[in-house]
A protein has these predicted regions:
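Periplasmic/cell-envelope proteins involved in peptidoglycan metabolism and beta-lactam response
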Residues: 1-331, 434-441, 555, 573, ...
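Beta-lactam-recognizing serine transpeptidase/beta-lactamase-like catalytic domain environment
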Residues: 69, 75, 231-241, 296-599, ...
Length: 686
């Protein structure tokens, strides 16, 4: 009946499922059965029969192929206790262990291992049968070869070729058993501390948090391989090897030669200041290596594509020994630190000052603000600004650097050349808060640049809600908001390259283990900040700063150069602490490199002296420009001797006092530009 037909149909359906399943199993067994069988069998083997084959982490090089970080092959010394403990009957049929003493002696002699530890492993209840005891890690290839040469010295020689003593030695060394070597890799940094902030370092296990090592860690890492054994149907051990896949290599935009130029300039600054302060001139190394300021930072950038050519700060640590605090603290200070304090001290050293620290830029911000005013058509070349030495804003006096003198009537070019705060405040009033903030955003302030390095800070800028007349006034000359060095360098580059804002970056290409390029980091044009016409104008204005204005000490004879000085009081105002800076470009007609230097709290009596930063930039350009195949042209008519005043006002004949700098104000609350103490502390922590 109908029920019988349903049962038959159900039965046939079930049978079809089983037939299909059987066919599938047969197919899998025929095509992949051996692979799966090996994997299952391998799970039952001891670690001696199944081990990880480590990958080789990719290298980091500079743009010319100089190795900055690489992984060298090293070896772990493994002892097969079971084999070394093999029992052999002597002539009297007694059990002996002839392999133990020769093996232990050789391990102690060639690897400096502890004899007691080895013997404890050979006799311990949980280890004496072990076939995998790691005795030493990361021994060199030379050490491995020396051990193997000792073991094999007589192995291929016949006894008749040896005298009696040599025959005995051959028999003795033949009893060295159970020692084998497991390949591993050790990360090494051939240039030690050079570019340490940029490169970063790895922890154990090829993990990293800092620098290029951290940002590109997943690219640099490869995939571990595996060697595993299994017993076949004849109970014979067979080995299968899945080779490790090496990591990719990162070719950076950095040029080691430029990095060395930067380092030398910072060292020369350190030595110069220490000797001026009475240090022993003969103690050259200490004078050069000990920073003569709270912080010093330098960025060298190609303004035409965003490539970072060099970047350095003054906390130099050895990438091969990054936890060594002795260059920075006394042993007593180190011993007194708890774990948290030690980690805080290390983190402060490891961070990249040029991207992680935000600060008030001071007058190096003025060129961007003048360019913004031109873009808004609120000023032109004929607009005049009358500097009376101060401006009264919202009932408060805010001084210019010329106070109690004046700069008089000035054009926009004069305002920049003289670094006149009064003129800048008048420009800010013409712009208005909303447009001023819009152009801060266009130039990238308050936003991440997106540089391919970890730990970049945002900086802190005002909003329309927090920017009143006073905040606008102080912001025009670079106080009351914060930036990072890389933000400032990228914004300034766009100002002088035709108005093109390129994303700063440190990776040029990524290559595989054969050297083939698998990824190229093409210049990323993010936006247009100003027109090409305004960019041309700003280059001309900034050239005037170097030839006739506050930046004369940065001038290199025979070259056309432009730039801007900065002297910013640190909070709280009036404490005598300053951050001085200079940002420059050369040559003016076709800029090849932007160089930006900061000296934070220099170790001098009068910190308000931008010449300290100008001298660093001048020294860098003196070496950098010929290296970039830019050669002197003496037709510019400038000697390059520079200004001796050390101020940002060429009309001031002597070094300014603490309250007479370009960014001084009468009221510290006004100087703060509306930022609270807590906000400024937060910025400094970033």
């Amino acid at each position: 009946g109908r029920m019988s037909r349903k049962l038959v149909a159900l039965f046939l359906g079930v049978m079809l499922v089983f037939v299909a399943l059987a066919i599938d199993i047969t197919y899998v067994n025929a095509t992949k059965g051996e692979k799966y069988e090996r994997q299952v069998l391998s799970q039952t083997q001891q670690s001696y029969d199944s081990r990880t084959i480590p990958f080789q982490r990719g290298s980091i090089t500079d743009r010319n192929g100089t190795i900055l970080a690489t992984s060298e092959k090293v070896y772990n010394v493994i002892l097969d206790c079971k084999l070394a403990n093999t029992t052999v009957k002597d002539e009297e049929k007694n059990d002996t262990h002839p392999y133990v003493d020769p093996t232990v002696a050789a391990l102690v002699e060639y690897f400096g291992l502890d004899e007691t530890d080895i013997r404890d492993r050979l006799t311990g209840e949980t280890t004496k049968e072990s076939q995998y005891q790691v005795l030493a890690r990361e021994v060199s290839m030379d050490a491995k070869k020396a051990f193997e040469a000792y073991v094999d010295e007589y192995a291929d020689k016949k006894n008749k070729e040896l005298d009696e003593n040599e025959q005995a030695e051959k028999a003795y060394r033949a009893n060295i058993r159970g020692v084998w070597f497991e390949e591993s890799y050790h990360r090494t940094y051939p240039l030690n501390s050079l570019a340490c902030d940029l490169i970063g370092f790895t922890y154990s296990g090829d993990t990293a948090d800092w620098g290029i090592e951290g940002y590109y860690s997943s690219i640099l890492n490869g995939v571990n391989g595996r060697q595993f054994g299994y017993y076949n149907e004849d109970a014979d051990m067979e080995q299968t090897i899945i080779e490790a896949q090496p990591g990719k290599n990162v070719v950076t935009t950095i040029d080691v030669n430029i990095q060395k130029i930067i380092r030398t300039a910072i060292e020369n600054y350190n030595e110069r200041i220490h000797v001026q302060n009475g240090a022993d001139e003969s103690d050259t190394e200490t004078n050069r290596q000990t920073k003569a300021a709270k912080n010093i930072g330098v960025v060298v950038m190609d303004p035409n594509n965003g490539e970072i050519l060099g970047m350095d700060s003054s906390d130099w640590y050895d990438l091969n020994n990054p936890r060594d605090l002795t260059p920075f603290y006394s042993q007593e200070e180190i011993d007194a630190m708890n774990d948290n304090e030690t980690m805080e001290a290390l983190s402060a050293i490891w961070k990249n000052y040029c991207i992680s620290d935000a600060y008030e830029p001071g007058s190096t911000a003025k060129p961007m603000n003048v360019a913004a005013a031109y873009s808004l058509d609120v000023i032109d070349d004929n607009t005049l600004f009358d500097c009376e030495g101060f401006e009264t804003i919202a009932g408060q006096m805010i001084r210019c650097g010329a106070y109690p003198g004046t700069h008089g009537v000035q054009t926009p070019a004069d305002v920049l050349k003289n670094s006149c705060n009064a003129g800048m405040m008048q420009i800010g009033q013409k712009m208005g808060a909303a447009e001023f903030l819009r152009y801060q955003d266009i130039f990238g302030f308050g936003s991440l640049t997106g540089i391919d390095l970890p730990g970049e800070a945002y900086g802190l800028v005002h909003t329309e809600d927090t920017m009143g007349p006073t905040e606008l006034a102080t912001s025009t000359f670079g106080q009351g908001y914060t930036v990072t060095m890389v933000q400032q360098a990228a914004a300034f580059s766009s100002l002088i390259n035709g108005g093109n804002y390129y994303q700063p970056h440190v990776m040029k290409t990524i290559t595989d283990s054969t050297g083939a390029v698998v990824e190229s980091n093409e210049p990323n044009l993010v936006r247009q900040t100003v027109s090409a016409e305004i960019s041309d104008k700003m280059r001309s204005f900034l050239q005037g700063v170097v030839t006739d204005g506050s930046g004369q000490s940065a001038k290199v004879a025979g070259y056309t150069m432009g730039g801007k000085t900065g002297t910013a009081q640190k909070y709280p105002r009036g404490n005598g602490k300053y951050l001085v800076s200079f940002i420059g470009f050369a040559p003016v007609e076709n800029p090849k490199a932007v160089v930006y230097a900061i000296v934070e709290e220099p170790d001098v009596e009068n910190q308000a002296n931008s010449v300290l930063a100008q001298e660093i930039v001048k020294e860098i350009y003196t070496e950098l420009l010929p290296y970039l195949n830019v050669f002197p042209d003496d037709t510019d008519g400038v000697t390059g001797e520079g200004s001796e005043t050390g101020t940002d006002d060429p009309n001031v004949a002597a070094p300014v006092q603490e309250d007479d700098t370009e960014n001084s104000a009468e009221n510290s609350n006004i100087e703060n530009g509306g930022l609270t103490n807590a906000e400024l502390d937060l910025i400094n922590e970033e």
